[in-house]
């Protein structure tokens, strides 16, 4: 391992971060796939930390914000997706504390409602399935459906 390798790996990592924010684990994986040694990767990650270019909490918050803007999702699904991105559980939980699951569930239900046909019970079942698939918990779904379908 040489300074040249470290410089190349750092430039590559900065390039990735220039495109979009990445988690620490994503950068580690990308550099590993590019053939850099573990020692070089750790040096690069330390350097990115000192430059404040790598922040898993910021990444998690931004990921949640952008993900739910496009497609409202529940806590279960977001937690799973953050885990897939390599965000540590404690950081994911901190980012998810700011998340309003009830509002997102209502938003997802309102988006789906115009496309549902049939009687109220049929619509309730379809909507329930849709919200479960989006990763919302049963209590939030129940409250949302009661609010929407009793009016």
Swiss-Prot record:
A single Pfam family it belongs to is: RecX_HTH2
Gene3D superfamilies noted in UniProt: Winged helix-like DNA-binding domain superfamily/Winged helix DNA-binding domain
Cystine bridges: none
GO CC terms of this entry: cytoplasm
UniProtKB keywords: Cytoplasm
Q: What processes in GO biological process is this protein linked to?
A: regulation of DNA repair
Q: Where is the protein situated, by its record's location annotation?
A: Cytoplasm
- Primary location group: cytoplasm
The source's superkingdom equals: Bacteria
| Protein family per UniProt | Belongs to the RecX family.
Function, as annotated: Modulates RecA activity.
User: What name does the UniProt record give this protein?
Assistant: Regulatory protein RecX
* Originating species: Prosthecochloris aestuarii (strain DSM 271 / SK 413)
Please name the gene that encodes this protein: recX
